[in-house]
Amino acid sequence: MLDIKWIRANPDKLDESLSKRGIDSVSKSIIHIDSEKRTLISLIQKLQHERKEKSSSVAHIYDKSSTDFEEIQNDVKLINQKITELETSLLHHEKRLSEIMDNLPNLVADDVPYGTNSDMNKVLKECGTIQNIKFPKHHYEIGKNLGMMDFNTATKMSGSRFVILKHDLAKLERALINFMIDVHTTEFNFFEVSPPCLVKDHAMYNVGQLPKFADASFETTTGYRLIPTAEVPLTNIFANTTLLEEKLPIRLVAFTPCFRSEVGSAGKDVKGMLRMHQFGKVELFTIATPKESNREFEYLTAAAEKILEKLGLPYRVVLLCSGDIGFAAHKTYDLEVWLPAQNCYREISSCSHFSSFQARRSLSKYRELCSKKVNFLHTINGSGLAVGRTIIAILENYQNSDGSVTIPEKLRNYMGGQKLITPLTETVF
């Protein structure tokens, strides 16, 4: 959510930011509705004061049958009617303003490049060495040949975009989760938590998922939503709180299953594990003061990069352009991993700086150490990493011509010293 006071003072800057995203200007509408709303509030307050004075004067009239008493009563009645009319109009204006404000995206950072789509994103760096693999197989071919990636059985019980991982691939998934969290907690000082995977609508609103992306999540019949990312519960830990500046920044890491309806993804990545309704993800989250937030954004991104470095996976860092950046994001880096079978980079992590956008929705504040002033915090989050896509990257980048897959060295201790994943000779199902 944006600050209405800032919009009043900077309407042109708002429209400029919206224009970079390809959105029509709305500052005139906002300022007009806001002005009418403030006028209504002023009129209501004036009438309430007048009513109070008249009601007080009634107490000094001892003859309740007098003309003066009757006139004042009639005046108070008319004032009440007028207040009711104005309050109805005020509610209408507040609703109109709220609808516009709730659908306003975050301001784009000054260093975010202009662009209309992902083709105009800016590659900042490429890391790692791309191996020359002759006739590389797709991850789903490798998984099937190993006998450890079962889409058919999953589809029978759950429909499309689900998978069952078996034996060493299930073990690899567990190893990756533990490895990622160990790196983030021991090397980058993130604090591990295990949050709920079901939340109420207000928690989704606080991070910017609602109302705009209501159809992107799964909703239960009892008023819950399955989280699309651990960003939702982690951000809401600090909702309606005021933290002390000396306690900041706070860095959290969590592994959760994530659930997405993938509305609008028909025909995209229909084969394999790239786009699933359910997937595991290790999420990084930081809450910080505005003066620390840019540094913390770079720090969080570096933590996500470190996983790719340790696993020996080629990747690149991409700065998203104004037309590709997320609704709530101020600035975003995508980490894209190399997939040999697709002969291209694919997103494996998205790290975003949200400035005060989410904090204003969730009322997350801090008290300055010296001045004791209370201000809104800044939030930052990113994948560290998406576990399923990391499995994909390992299968494709570490595939061998005999059908086996080499386990990255950093994961071997997490897999009992195992060095290779070889095809199953028999399976229980």
Curated annotation (Swiss-Prot):
Keyword tags: Aminoacyl-tRNA synthetase, ATP-binding, Cytoplasm, Ligase, Nucleotide-binding, Protein biosynthesis
SUPFAM superfamilies to which the protein is assigned, alphabetical: Class II aaRS and biotin synthetases (SSF55681), tRNA-binding arm (SSF46589)
GO CC terms of this entry: cytoplasm
Pfam families: Seryl_tRNA_N (PF02403), tRNA-synt_2b (PF00587)
UniProt catalytic activity: tRNA(Ser) + L-serine + ATP = L-seryl-tRNA(Ser) + AMP + diphosphate + H(+); tRNA(Sec) + L-serine + ATP = L-seryl-tRNA(Sec) + AMP + diphosphate + H(+)
Enzyme class: ligase
Compartment annotation: Cytoplasm
Taxonomic superkingdom: Bacteria
Major site of localization recorded for this protein: cytoplasm
GO annotation, biological process: selenocysteine biosynthetic process; seryl-tRNA aminoacylation
Pathway terms, separated by semicolons: Aminoacyl-tRNA biosynthesis; selenocysteinyl-tRNA(Sec) biosynthesis; L-seryl-tRNA(Sec) from L-serine and tRNA(Sec): step 1/1
Residues that coordinate or bind ATP: R260, S261, E262, E347, I348, S349, S350
Residues annotated to bind L-serine: T229, A230, E231, E283, S383
Enzyme Commission number(s) of this protein: 6.1.1.11
Gene Ontology molecular-function annotations: ATP binding; serine-tRNA ligase activity
Function: Catalyzes the attachment of serine to tRNA(Ser). Is also able to aminoacylate tRNA(Sec) with serine, to form the misacylated tRNA L-seryl-tRNA(Sec), which will be further converted into selenocysteinyl-tRNA(Sec).
Subunit structure: Homodimer. The tRNA molecule binds across the dimer.
HAMAP family, per the entry: Ser_tRNA_synth_type1
Family named by the database record: Belongs to the class-II aminoacyl-tRNA synthetase family. Type-1 seryl-tRNA synthetase subfamily.
This protein's name: Serine--tRNA ligase
Organism: Orientia tsutsugamushi (strain Ikeda)
Gene from which this protein is expressed: serS
